[in-house]
A protein has these predicted regions:
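Conserved structured core elements
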Residues: 22, 93, 138, 186-187
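N-terminal Rossmann-like FAD-binding beta1-loop-alpha1 element of flavoenzymes
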Residues: 11-37
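Mobile, glycine-rich extracellular loop/lid and propeptide segments
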Residues: 19, 175, 187
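Core beta-strand elements of the Rossmann-like FAD/NAD(P) dinucleotide-binding domain
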Residues: 6-10, 180-187
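Alpha-helix N-cap/helix-initiation motif
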Residues: 17-18, 133, 183-185
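N-terminal charge/polar-biased segments
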Residues: 1-9, 19, 154
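Conserved N-terminal/central alpha/beta ligand/cofactor-binding core
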Residues: 3-4, 40-180
Length: 187
């Protein structure tokens, strides 16, 4: 006896509900109405990011991305995608400001300047930490989930994706199952 599959229709399907999946969904929601996140873990758990410190390495406006990339190329012995790193660093300050707008608080000194910790022995690489320290990953997860909720991004947990559905060379969906019930799912 086979279970009748759950069938979901969406404009954009995001596989993975961690920080990257959440940001992908927020970006997709700027362009389409119906966005769905599926995750193998519990709904809204935040992936491994939820267990992080909630801190960020950010290229502040006074630095040039190419200078930070140069430091990272040295640090990683050249084994990094420099163009990708530069793009991430160029966007990092905007994401930092987005987090602050959503209510994530980064530590500041008495004069209001951001506090940072140098990273990896590099001159320009700075780590900006969540305040109060120690609960930042959980808080980041909460604010991302609140923003997803505000924008009506649908989220389903405990979904194991087993394959992608293709229409020619284009991916048009995914198939999997609900991990607790075993019910097949088609997206």
């Amino acid at each position: 006896m086979s279970a009748k599959p759950f069938v979901f229709d969406t404009d954009v399907l995001i596989i993975g509900g961690g920080f990257s999946g959440s940001w992908a969904a927020l970006t997709a929601r700027q362009h389409v109405e119906n966005v769905l996140i599926v995750d193998k873990g519990p709904r809204d758990w935040g992936g491994l990011g939820g267990m992080s410190g909630g801190d960020m390495i950010v290229k502040q406006p006074e630095f040039a991305a190419k200078d930070l990339v140069e430091e990272l190329v040295y640090y990683y012995d050249g084994l990094c995608e420099q163009d990708v790193l530069e793009e991430i660093l160029n966007q990092s300050y905007e994401r930092f400001k987005d987090y602050e707008k959503m209510g994530h608080e980064f530590a500041r000194d008495d004069s209001g300047r951001l506090m940072s910790i140098p990273q990896r022995g590099l001159e320009l690489m700075r780590y900006y930490f969540y305040h109060p320290y120690g609960k930042g990953g959980a808080h980041t997860t909460q604010i991302l989930n609140a923003e997803l909720q505000r924008l009506n991004v649908q989220r389903i947990g405990r979904i194991e994706i087993t394959d992608l559905v293709k229409d020619g060379d284009a991916v048009s969906g995914a198939v999997g199952f609900h991990a607790q019930s075993g019910t097949p799912c088609l997206f």
